Amino acid sequence: LREPDLWWQLRSGQWMVENFAVTRSDLFSFTQEGVEWINVKWFFEVLQYFFASLGGPELLLLMQTFANILLLWMLYKLAQTVYSLQLVKKFQVGIAFIISVLSFLFAMDYRMAGRPEMVSHVLSLAFLLLLLNHRREKSKGIFWLIPLQLFWANSHEAYGTGLVILVVAIAAHLFESRIRKWEPLDKNFMLSSLLAIASTGINPRGLYLFIHPFNIFNQVGDNKFTTELYNIQTNYFWQQTEAWLAIGVLFICLIGFFLFRKKLGSPGILKQFGLAYFVLFVLFIYLGSTAHRNLTFFFIWAFPLLLLTIESIGQWKLKNIKLFG
C-alpha cells in the first residue's frame, strides 16, 4: 500500500455503509469541507471498506490480485480471439504470448496499487475483448457491455473511457455497414451499445454523469501538484520508464500495422480488426500523452497488435533460420 489517499476512500466507504447514503459533499478535508463532491467511485469505496473490514487495509491488495487475475484471463481470451484473425498461426501459449503478457504486466505495474482505477483497467480490456470477439462470433455476449458500463459509471471516474469506446464503435460500425458496405448492420451490437451508453445515467447523480467527464478532464488539466497527472510536455513524464515503454510498444505496433497492411491491404486490415480499433488506438495514444497515469489505457489497447507483431516477427525469423541454417 503506497497511495496516500486510500484512507480517504476507506473512510468514505465506511461513512456510506454506516449512513446508508452516498456522499454528496466533502466530509474529510480541512480546506474543502462541505463543498459539493461528485463521488463517482462510491460503489467501489463501499467494496474497499468491505474488504478492509474483513482483515485490515492490507486486503485491498487482495482486490488488486483479483483484478490482476481477471486481466490475465482476459489477455488469454483476447489472444485466442486475435489469433483467429488468421494473420498468424493458430494460437498457443508460446514465446510471443509470454513476452507480450510480461511486457504488459511490467508496463502496468506502476498503477496496480489497490486503487479504484483497477476497475477502469479491467473494464477497458473487457470492452476490447467483447468488441473484437463480436467481430468473429456475432454472439449475444456483446450485451455484457450494458452491466459493465453501469458498474463502471458507479465505480471510477474514468467511466467516460467506456462512453468514448462505445461512441467510436457505433460510428465506425455505421461507416462500415452503411457507407463502405463491408457488412450488414448489426442490430445486436447497436442495441447493446446504445443501452450501455444509456446505463451510464443509472447512478446517484443521474444524467449529470454524461457531462461530468468534461469537468474531470478540465480538473485534471488544472492540477499542477499531482505528479501522476503530468503530461507529455513535462520533464517528469519523460523521466518515467513507462513513457519510453510506450514509445517502444508504439514502434513495434507500427511495424506490425505495416506488415499486415502489406499482407492484406488497407481495407483488409481494417476489416479484420475493425475501424474502431484503430481510431481508438490513436485516441489512446493521445490520452496517454495527457497524463503519466493514462498510459495504462494505451498499453491495454495496444496488446492485440503487439502480440500479433511479435508472433509475426518470430515466425519470419524462424523461417529464415530454416532457409539459411
What are these model-derived regions, one by one?
Residues L130-L150, K187-L191, Q272-F281:
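Short hydrophobic alpha-helices at membrane interfaces in multi-pass membrane enzymes
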Residues L125-I142, I255-F257, R261-G265:
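Membrane-interface transmembrane helices that cradle and orient dolichyl/undecaprenyl
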Residues D5, V17, V22, E157-G268, ...:
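Transmembrane catalytic cores of multi-pass membrane glycosyltransferases
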Residues T31-E58, L62, F66:
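Short hydrophobic/aromatic helix or loop-helix immediately within or flanking a transmembrane segment
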Residues Y110-V119:
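Short acidic/glycine- and proline-prone juxtamembrane loop motifs at membrane-interface regions
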Residues Q9, I165, L287-G314:
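Hydrophobic/aromatic-rich transmembrane helices and adjacent perimembrane loops
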Residues F104-M108, L129, G141-E157, L195-T200, ...:
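Membrane-interface alpha helices of multi-pass inner-membrane proteins
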Residues L62-Q86:
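Transmembrane-helix motifs of polytopic, lipid-linked glycan transferases
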